[in-house]
């Protein structure tokens, strides 16, 4: 059978919090089968757990948060969640000694390296996928996102930013998902923001960790980072990275075709909640062997070496 995945060993890294600008220690721990993805704040006494759950997601101006019933939150979970989706990690406990996951370089790549360093372990329990059975679409003005049935996982994302630096690059990106494709084509794409917004937020004591080290920064005309872009179309690739993380908030890889126009964290989450709320639109599936498994989810040699 296709088995659930966790880590082989505990790994740790430090980074800076996007909101506070303070050092954050991140610890990734293996977890038993059917634990799911658990985010944990160890700066609170007692520590507070936040299971990845579409209904717990709140979209703020700067990031995605998970919020519990007592209104306690953990922030900036989206890029790490994308790395978990990319490598198909089903069970993990993610600890931080702060209210937020460190921003690292603004992409998912540092988290991918950390997960690969921990090693991927297979558990003796069937991996559950969410398979889309009916088309589900959500809209917000001219923005929309939808899932259609498809035996694999494809993503097709279009952005529409009126900016010289972004107009010059492609505003649409489509891919057949796989762990290899995610690592090579998506994981290194960084988040982006306007210099004037960062300066304004920092003047109000917000976004204190925001810098050229953790984002693509643009003014009204150009990219300000000395090293430029990692991809010509890094902006739309990062929006796809965000979507992969947002859609994995159900804790399972999804089998279906995702298409979006001008979508963001809030609309991606609205789509996920709409799918899960419509019982006839999806089902849990497991696979007995590799031959049945959609190509998208076959483990690359780098992951299970």
UniProtKB/Swiss-Prot annotation:
The active site is at 265 (proton donor). This is UDP-3-O-acyl-N-acetylglucosamine deacetylase. Its EC number is 3.5.1.108. InterPro entries: Ribosomal_Su5_D2-typ_SF, UDP-acyl_GlcNac_deAcase, UDP-acyl_GlcNac_deAcase_C, UDP-acyl_N-AcGlcN_deAcase_N. The lineage of its organism: Bacteria, Pseudomonadati, Pseudomonadota, Gammaproteobacteria, Enterobacterales. Belongs to the LpxC family. GO terms for cellular component: membrane. Keywords: Hydrolase, Lipid A biosynthesis, Lipid biosynthesis, Lipid metabolism, Metal-binding, Zinc. It holds the Pfam family LpxC. HAMAP family: LpxC. Zn(2+) binds at residues 79, 238, 242. It comes from Citrobacter koseri (strain ATCC BAA-895 / CDC 4225-83 / SGSC4696). Pathway: Glycolipid biosynthesis; lipid IV(A) biosynthesis; lipid IV(A) from (3R)-3-hydroxytetradecanoyl-[acyl-carrier-protein] and UDP-N-acetyl-alpha-D-glucosamine: step 2/6. It catalyses: a UDP-3-O-[(3R)-3-hydroxyacyl]-N-acetyl-alpha-D-glucosamine + H2O = a UDP-3-O-[(3R)-3-hydroxyacyl]-alpha-D-glucosamine + acetate. One of its GO terms (biological process) is lipid A biosynthetic process. One of its GO terms (molecular function) is metal ion binding. Catalyzes the hydrolysis of UDP-3-O-myristoyl-N-acetylglucosamine to form UDP-3-O-myristoylglucosamine and acetate, the committed step in lipid A biosynthesis. Its cofactor is Zn(2+).
């Amino acid at each position: 059978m296709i088995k659930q995945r966790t880590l082989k060993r505990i790994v740790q890294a430090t980074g800076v919090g996007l909101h506070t600008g303070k050092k954050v220690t991140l610890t990734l721990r293996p977890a038993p089968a059917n634990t799911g993805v658990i985010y944990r704040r160890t700066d609170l006494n007692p520590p507070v757990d936040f299971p990845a759950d579409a209904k717990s997601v709140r979209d703020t101006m700067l990031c995605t948060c998970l919020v519990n019933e007592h209104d306690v939150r953990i922030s900036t979970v989206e890029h790490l969640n994308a790395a978990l989706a990319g490598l198909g990690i089903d069970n993990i406990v993610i600890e931080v000694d702060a209210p937020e996951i460190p921003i690292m370089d603004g992409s998912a790549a540092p988290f991918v390296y950390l997960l690969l360093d921990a090693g991927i372990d297979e558990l003796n329990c069937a991996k559950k996928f969410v398979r889309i059975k009916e088309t589900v679409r959500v809209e917000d003005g001219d923005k929309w996102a939808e899932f259609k049935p498809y035996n694999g996982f494809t993503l097709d994302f279009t952005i529409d930013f009126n900016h010289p630096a972004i107009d010059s690059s492609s505003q649409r990106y489509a891919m057949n998902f796989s762990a290899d494709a995610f690592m090579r084509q998506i994981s290194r794409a960084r988040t982006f923001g306007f210099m004037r917004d960062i300066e304004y937020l920092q003047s109000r004591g917000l976004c204190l960790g925001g810098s050229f080290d953790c984002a693509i920064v643009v003014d009204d005309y150009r990219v300000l980072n000395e090293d430029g872009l990692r991809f010509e179309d890094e902006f739309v690739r990062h929006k796809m990275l965000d979507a992969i993380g947002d859609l994995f908030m159900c804790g399972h890889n999804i089998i279906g075709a995702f298409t979006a126009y001008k979508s963001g964290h809030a609309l991606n989450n609205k789509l996920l909640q709409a799918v899960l709320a419509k019982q006839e639109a999806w089902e849990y599936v497991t696979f007995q062997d590799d031959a049945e498994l959609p190509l998208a989810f076959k483990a690359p040699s780098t992951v299970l070496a």
